[in-house]
Design a protein with these regions (language model features):
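ATP/NTP phosphate-donor binding region
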Residues: 1-92, 344, 378
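A glycine/threonine-rich phosphate-anchoring loop and its flanking beta-alpha core
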Residues: 13, 27, 114-222, 315
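Structural motif
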Residues: 14, 36-38, 64, 91-94, ...
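Buried hydrophobic positions in well-ordered alpha/beta secondary-structure cores of metabolic enzymes
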Residues: 18, 39, 74, 99, ...
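Short Gly/Thr/Asp-enriched flexible loops that form oxyanion-binding sites at enzyme active sites
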Residues: 51-54, 82, 101-115, 159-160
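Glycine/serine-rich anion-binding loops at beta->alpha junctions
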Residues: 90-106, 151-156, 285-288
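Active-site segments that bind and position negatively charged phosphate/pyrophosphate groups
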Residues: 214-330
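C-terminal charged capping/lid subdomain of soluble metabolic enzymes
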Residues: 313, 317-388
Length: 388
């Protein structure tokens, strides 16, 4: 029997895939009738030949570039980006980059809509869900939208929320609004060509984490199972192929589509669980990049949950190409094959940090979604020991 639920169709219009990004962007800007396009990116993209290609394709519609985005999209850089958009009189933001760039552009939208001009002003909007992500709000016409062109596999472009860090307090906070999902996503595998291979592989494992935790969920539905299973097949085969042959654009295209599908289960109401919750805490407390948190945590989380969802985990193992139904081993084998870190100690995490990490993770809302109930920080420390 299929459990009751709801599938939400978000305020995203198009996902363009497999076409040259510069030409596709020019066509989308024409369709959207935008005249002042600000590119939001980081210094590495801004200093590459990519930016010149986009500027040429946009012609007089190119209003400039904000290249000040840094890791974890600090509040200050978001405020500076919003000021650049105001100065350019921008009517469209084009985010070219990975998760930090796309998150920064989303929070810039919020700053522009509510005239936030100081980092402290963001506090009034953090951590709050603002509206149903499938419902167009009354003020929709007052939002400047985003076209996202990803260069990694973080899949930030497929959500209606973004994060910005506050270095003074040592936290990264979520900001949420239905209009923060990009209006258009353009997936061009060539846009990943300059991405360092370790970053491509670890963000690919983050996408594996998205799909695996959704496929492991006890409240899963047929839509979620279909998209999450295929996401794992595309991602596992694509990661192996890209690792063997970095110039294989077909593999990179499969990876982009797999990252897209890894997020689709969320649209049918299926959330991720404890792996993501501990990953959030690990990133905040120990500054471990999210892709590396997935590599070091996910196999242990699956093993800890195995008694609660063994049948679901067999689906994961099969989608990863394993002959046996042990998802933890199948994931560990994939991570080892890719030459990525497999243990928390490999990424500089000390056992001394476990109590603080466990405390943060226990308070994360995603912990409630875990197939096996998490009753104490001791449960989480047990997983951390398994992963260390």
């Amino acid at each position: 029997m299929i459990a009751p639920g709801m599938h939400r169709f978000l305020l995203m219009e198009r996902v363009v895939h497999g076409r040259p990004a510069a030409a596709a962007l020019a066509e989308e800007v024409d369709r959207l009738e935008r005249r002042r396009v600000l590119v939001v990116t980081n210094r590495s993209v801004a200093n590459s030949a990519l930016l010149a290609g986009f500027a040429a394709s946009l012609g007089e519609r190119y209003a400039g570039c904000f290249s000040g985005v840094t890791a974890h999209s600090p509040r200050r850089c978001v405020i500076e980006g919003a000021e650049a958009a105001r100065a350019a009189n921008a009517d469209l933001l084009v985010a070219i980059g990975g998760g930090s760039v796309i998150d920064a552009a989303k929070v810039m939208q919020l700053c522009l809509r509510h005239d936030i001009r100081d980092p402290a002003g963001l506090s009034d909007y953090s951590g709050r869900g603002r509206g149903d992500p499938s419902t167009r709000p009354a003020d929709a016409d007052r939002w400047i939208r985003i076209v996202a062109i990803p260069t990694t596999l973080s899949a930030a472009e497929f959500t209606w929320f973004g994060g910005a860090s506050d270095p003074e307090r040592g936290v990264k906070e979520p900001f949420t609004h239905p209009m923060m999902i990009p209006q258009v996503v353009i997936m061009d595998p060539a846009m990943t060509a300059e991405t360092p291979m370790p970053l491509l592989l670890t963000t690919g494992m983050k996408a594996v984490d998205h799909a695996a935790e959704r496929l492991a969920a006890l409240n899963a539905n047929p839509y979620n199972d279909a998209v999450s299973s295929l996401a794992l097949r595309l991602l596992s085969s694509g990661l192996r192929a890209a690792h063997r042959a970095p110039a294989d654009m077909g593999a990179r295209g499969d990876l982009q589509y797999g990252a897209f599908m890894s997020m689709c289960g969320s649209w049918s109401g299926i959330a991720v669980g404890l792996g993501h919750a501990i990953g959030h805490a690990l990133g905040a407390h120990c500054a471990v990049p999210h892709g590396e948190t997935s590599c070091t945590l996910l196999p242990s989380v699956m093993r800890w949950n195995a008694d609660a969802n063994g049948a679901r985990q067999a689906l994961i193992a099969g989608a990863l190409g394993a002959r046996e139904g042990d998802a933890g081993t199948a994931l560990a084998d994939l991570i080892n094959e890719l030459g990525l870190p497999t243990r928390l100690r490999d990424v500089g995490v000390s056992r001394d940090a476990f109590p603080a990490i466990a405390h943060k993770a226990l308070g994360d809302v995603l912990t409630r979604n875990n197939p096996r109930p998490v009753r104490s920080t001791g449960d989480i420390e047990e997983i951390l020991e398994m992963a260390w």
